[in-house]
Amino acid sequence: MNKDEVFLRQWFEILYSLTNPEANSDLRRINNEKGVEKVGQKRSAESRREGKKKRVKTQCVIKSSDKSDHDTLLKKKRRERIRRQLETLKEITPNCPQSDINAILDCVIEYTNNLRLAHYKGSQGICDDWRLFTEAGAVLYYIDT
């Protein structure tokens, strides 16, 4: 057998063992020339138990009260950040005196849609005066005298 045939045989054995969980465990054990186990190989029960013991020892235990305090602080910071960002949106958007979250978001959406419409009409040459779209939600019509 040449190297290609050996490789193909080992490759098919690996694929078969991965697709068939009841396959012979010897098929899952493929050793290289030095006798070192490869990644796809099953570990012995003893080494698995040792691994579990090591993992249990390295895990740290967090008290539930510490975790709840941490969660409470995170939620409070999140609410404050949302409140600040809503205030910023309210300041940026003209004619938005409401303090309700839904009303602020409605004003911002309406203002953004009006700006998008003004940009579209300006790019199409339909309307050259962008000042027609300055108010949030209301198009100002004026007579140039």
From Swiss-Prot:
Residues 66-115 form the bHLH domain. It comes from the Eukaryota. Its main location: nucleus. GO terms for biological process: embryo development ending in seed dormancy. One of its GO terms (molecular function) is protein dimerization activity. It is found in: Nucleus. The keyword DNA-binding applies. Residues 33-49 have a biased composition (Basic and acidic residues). Keywords: Developmental protein, DNA-binding, Nucleus, Transcription, Transcription regulation. SUPFAM superfamilies: HLH, helix-loop-helix DNA-binding domain. Residues 33-61 are annotated as: Disordered. GO terms for cellular component: nucleus. Required during early embryo development, for the endosperm formation. Homodimer. This is Transcription factor MEE8.
